[in-house]
A protein has these predicted regions:
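Extended, histidine- and acidic-residue-enriched regions that form the cofactor-binding/catalytic faces
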Residues: 1-181
Length: 181
């Protein structure tokens, strides 16, 4: 079964929305998805890099945890999941994902941690020099067929580029408020 982490931040979204709505939107979506397919939903992680660019934290509730702190946590978590035996790990985020390909601090920390965890895990399991061995000569052919250990952990925005193009989207406005309703 896929293992899924709801990932988000505690960020002020005005008086009309809950602090943490970015994570709550992911949790609700995964609850709906769980009715349609078998997945393991990990406890949500709310403590991302929210920043204070919209409002200062005082009296608002935003809690910023820097990417430099998120990275070691995420790397340890992913390493633990790999050691358990999971090979289909996903995190979904709804915070600053309007340009997910380029990335923002929270998702970049988790993406980098995923790569580092996989590299370290493979080196631990296969030994140093594993990628340069003869049995890896067909790596790129296997990769095209989907057999790639670097696909064991993937990050996803809650809303695809197409969804964002087709529906009004904003920060704490009509789009995000509608998402919470």
């Amino acid at each position: 079964w896929p293992v899924v982490l709801p990932l988000g931040v505690l960020e002020y979204h005005g008086e009309h929305l809950a602090v943490g709505m970015d994570t709550l939107a992911v949790i609700k979506t995964l609850d709906i998805l769980e009715r349609e397919m078998d997945i393991v939903i990990l406890p949500p992680f709310y403590y991302g890099a929210s920043s204070y660019v919209v409002e200062p934290p005082e009296g608002r509730g935003s809690l910023h945890v820097g990417a430099q702190v998120l990275f070691p946590f995420a790397q340890e978590m992913f390493t633990g999941l790999l050691r358990i035996g999971f090979r289909n790990i996903h995190f979904f985020i709804h915070h600053q994902t309007e340009n997910f390909t380029v990335g923002m601090p929270t998702d970049l920390a988790f993406k980098f941690a995923a790569r580092q965890a996989i590299f370290a895990f493979l080196e631990r399991e296969r030994g140093e020099g594993w990628w340069g061995r003869a049995e890896m000569a067909d790596y790129y052919a296997r990769q095209k067929g989907g057999n790639d250990p670097f696909n064991w952990i993937k990050g996803h925005p809650l809303m695809t580029d197409e969804t964002i193009r087709n529906y009004p989207f904003d920060h704490a406005g009509v789009g995000e408020t509608s998402l919470m309703l």
